[in-house]
């Protein structure tokens, strides 16, 4: 089994990383492979609801200029997903929200049947 942990904090080794690292450590202690992917300072374009991802049916966003399609590819090869993000002004960090919206719309098929969790700090 493999779990993808996505660190949506702009601080590479901040509190979100600490929480995800401890989660990964516990998973690995139980024989579960864990990968932490940091997206924090990478540009993530917001979804414009153009619908092209649904038309093409390939679990990909037509905008291939950020990390979204890379994350979707990793999601396809994992068995569970954990998204971690800090909370700023009552909401998760902007990069994490934009990524979540794009992943769910463009890569929704990659999520089906997979457990998912969110860690906020």
What are these regions (language model features)?
Residues 62-121:
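Helix-loop-strand module that forms the ligand-binding subsite of alpha/beta enzymes
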Residues 18-21, 50-52, 95-99:
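Short, glycine/charged-enriched secondary-structure capping and boundary segments
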Residues 13-16, 57, 91-92:
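Glycine/Thr-rich phosphate-binding loops of Rossmann-like dinucleotide-binding domains
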Residues 2-32:
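N-terminal beta1-alpha1 ligand-phosphate binding loop
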Residues 42-75:
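Cysteine-cluster motifs in flexible loop/terminal segments that predominantly coordinate metals
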Residues 25, 35, 70-73:
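Short amphipathic alpha-helices and their capping/turn segments at secondary-structure boundaries
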């Amino acid at each position: 089994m493999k779990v993808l942990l996505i660190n949506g904090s702009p601080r590479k080794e901040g509190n979100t990383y600490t929480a995800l690292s401890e989660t990964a450590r516990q998973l690995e202690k139980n024989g579960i492979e864990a990968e932490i992917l940091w997206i924090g300072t990478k540009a993530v374009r917001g979804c414009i609801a153009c619908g092209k991802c649904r038309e093409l049916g390939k679990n990909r966003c037509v905008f291939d200029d950020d990390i979204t399609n890379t994350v979707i590819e990793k999601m396809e090869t994992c068995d569970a997903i954990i998204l971690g993000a800090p909370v700023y002004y009552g909401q998760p960090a902007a990069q994490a929200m934009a990524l979540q919206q794009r992943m769910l719309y463009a890569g929704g098929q990659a999520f089906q049947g997979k457990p998912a969790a969110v860690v906020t700090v």
